[in-house]
Amino acid sequence: MVFVMSAWSASGQDSLTLVFAGDIMQHESQMKAAFDPAKGSYDYRGVFEGVKPWIQSADIAIANLELTFGGKPYTGYPQFSAPDEFLAAIKDAGFDVLVTANNHSVDRGRSGLERTLRRLDSAGLLHTGTFADTLDFLNHYPLILEARGFRISLLNYTYGTNGIAVRRPNRVNPIDTAQIRKDLARARQQKTDAVVVVFHWGDEYQQLPNRAQQEVAGFCLSQGAKLIIGSHPHVLQPMYWNRDQDNLVVYSLGNFISGQRARYRNGGALLHVTLRKDHTAEGTPRTTLADVSYSLSWVNRLPDSRRSFRLVPVGDPVDSLAVTGSNSRALYKEFINDSRVFLDRENRNVGERARRKRD
């Protein structure tokens, strides 16, 4: 099935911008901060306000939804079920697509998985990775996104579901190279301009990818994938743009929004990708990676009565002023320094957008 994100102008638009975010989570501390006892409801206004311009500037914005909208009772770790008001905030932030295959997909069993899919549909958010049944999978996978004259295939897989069985007829895509091979072949048959694969993989809190991640990434590249994006470690991992082979592997974007406050886990990165389509003399278009960069964002807790959560875009001097208090300022600076030192050392051809603009 094809979903049109935006129209293509007759002027011959030949570039497409994508933004990828890491893990969207909802811990108990986040729910407590958002709860309004006077209204008996949850208020997430402002959580994403600082990074909205980054998200909304993209033609397509994609994130990893690492929770369910399984209904009450609302719970955080270890089995997540977030208030529906949080979904409204995600939509308002500007996200277009959520990938849903991860180790928390069936935290609320079959009913939670299916309710999550219904809520995403009601909100007008596209999704892939989990399915109500086999027919749903066959009709909607790979997910094809159309924008500005581009057709993009999106695939999504997880290493597991925390030992919770996926109840029939539900489906959660596992990392199975035999099945992935078939899915990538199907994507090629759909004649899309680029194939994007998002994996939930790796070791939690480890900054370097393990051998399994590297092997699966290499396998997918050999089968025609152009972009591979990872989640699950909850910390940043390296980003490799192979200009010669024209492909990109980002092993982990870290936490986008969560209640985790430990070092390396209290923020993450947004990935900015520009695809360019060139029309050859024979009329056969060729799509390449024209530009790749990242932006850091940090999760701040405000000094208000609720200790509200706010995303702070690193590099924006106005938003950084919102980080007040000596302890918060110290944590903010620590995250920036840790992230820059690590990514400057490990990344290949992927730099920070804010610093590149200053240069």
Model-identified regions with their sequence ranges:
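Bacterial N-terminal signal peptides
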Residues: 1-7
